[in-house]
Regions:
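N-terminal cationic and glycine-rich segments that engage phosphates or anionic surfaces
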Residues: 1-126, 133-458
Length: 458
């Protein structure tokens, strides 16, 4: 009972602090005053609630009591790095054997593959230059590939579930049941994709990103309660340690926001042009080059590779590289994150294209000749700012392991101290706030920050 009280007090304190923030209260009032924005926010919240309800609808033929909290399967999820991470991303639907168990990860996997193909295969490269029609074709290919990924992942999920908890299968694990359950899982993920598209079109923010974030955030109360339980079962000083953990979590969030928002502004001067009686150009603008241009992708790629040793279970190699708190696991993960940060930044940032666009629009960087020198200048800046960004990203990637090893934080709660969970939450919240702010500023209301602009918005 004391543990529940502590968690309740923590959330009440957070709510009280938000309620006493006059700027936030005023912003919420302004959101309500703008009819279009109000409808979009309510629409988004409604569809997110539908998604959360779907996370508790168990696949027919599976006994939910065999998978509940305290079961062997639930304990196995908490202790397994890969499965635990998938359960976090799905908001617990993975562990519930729900119809939405596979979440949006198959779609994310397909999107990454299509994105990489767009950088290497001429057919997809051409589609990227075809504007809106090309984007629609790419989206269609992504949907088809998502179904392909689901056809592989659905039976694998059912097979793993049967291996872990055979008693949960009411009618056994026949071929017919696997096909039936896989069809439901495919329909569940396609439904999530539909929800995401509707939120993007008629709601606020990016639908798929918000669905991922709400799934992660939904696990926070459960993770916090597990951490409080663990602390109160130890010796005295548990309350102090819990407070220190929450303070540390706040500082980590602030540092991550700084990482996501950090940019290097490159000045660009545009030549004056006279069209008719009007003069254009002659002003100085800036190109914002992000320190963490690759965002969360390097951690996703690195963690995907770190799951390979699990295929060689029972060997010394697997033991050394499969422990989330082990030295070699975290050292290798950090090195991979740094390498993938440079790799992915080089793919998505094209100095040659930026230089050509500037030249085409009559722009130039003061003190730098257009053409090859501009390309080299931008490339040099990106190399310099990517170095600290990659190291910071590597630290974020291994923070959950450090929190578990040196602070004794439970794995479920440690996920919120770094890695993909933290970056996704921060990135999605900032992007959504920027979109809300644009509506407010268009209606001549104050933005979400004292300056009227969110830091890093350009």
């Amino acid at each position: 009972m004391n543990q529940y009280l502590v968690v309740g007090v923590v959330f009440l304190v957070v709510i009280a602090l938000l309620a006493t923030n006059k700027k936030l209260v005023e912003t919420l009032k302004n959101i309500y005053k703008i009819e279009e924005l109000r409808k979009r926010v309510i629409y988004t919240i409604g569809l997110l609630l539908v998604y959360r309800l779907g996370s508790f609808v168990v696949i027919p033929g599976i006994n939910p009591n065999a998978l509940g909290e305290g079961s062997a399967y639930a304990s196995q999820l908490e202790g397994n790095g890969l499965l635990g991470l998938l359960n976090v991303f799905s908001g617990g639907a993975f562990g519930n054997a729900a119809i939405l168990a596979l979440g949006v990860m198959p779609y994310i996997t397909a999107s990454i593959i299509i994105q990489l193909m767009g950088m290497m295969i001429p057919y997809f490269q051409k589609m990227q230059t075809e504007g809106e029609s090309g984007r629609r074709k790419m989206n269609q290919w992504t949907r088809f590939l998502t179904i392909g990924v689901l056809i592989l992942q659905g039976p694998a999920y059912i097979a793993n579930l049967y291996h872990q908890v055979p008693t949960a299968f009411v009618y056994g694990n026949s071929f017919g049941f696997v096909a039936y359950a896989t069809t439901i899982l495919i329909a569940g993920t396609m439904f999530i994709m539909w929800l995401g598209e509707k939120i993007t079109d008629k709601g606020i923010g990016n639908g798929i990103s918000l669905i991922i974030m709400i799934g992660i955030v939904a696990r926070l109360p459960h993770a916090l309660l597990a951490e409080v339980n663990a602390r109160f079962q130890t010796a005295s000083g548990s309350a102090i340690m819990l407070i220190l953990e929450l303070v540390l979590l706040f500082l980590v969030f602030m540092a991550t926001i700084a990482l996501v928002q950090a940019v290097r502004k490159v000045p660009v001067q545009y030549a004056k042009r006279i069209v008719g009686n009007k003069q254009y150009g002659g002003v100085r603008q800036y190109i914002p080059l992000k320190m963490n241009a690759a965002n969360v992708m390097p951690i996703i790629f690195a963690q995907a590779l770190m799951f390979i040793p699990a295929l060689f279970s029972g060997t010394a190699f697997a033991a050394a590289f499969s422990s989330m708190t082990g030295f070699w696991y975290n050292f290798t993960l950090a090195v991979l994150v740094i390498a993938f940060t440079y790799f992915y930044t080089a793919i998505i940032i094209n100095p040659q294209m930026m230089a050509d666009d500037m030249k085409r629009n009559g722009g130039f960087i003061p003190g730098v000749k257009p053409g090859k020198q501009t390309v080299n200048y931008i490339d040099t800046i990106m190399t310099r700012i990517t170095l600290p960004g990659s190291f910071f990203l590597a630290i974020v990637a291994i923070l959950p392991a450090l929190a578990m090893k040196f602070l004794g934080i439970q794995q479920a709660f440690a996920y919120f101290y770094g890695g993909t969970s933290l970056l996704i939450m921060v990135g999605v919240v900032l992007d959504t706030l920027k979109q809300i702010e644009s509506y407010l500023l268009m209606r001549h209301y104050d933005g979400l920050m004292k300056t009227g602009r969110i830091q890093g918005r350009h």
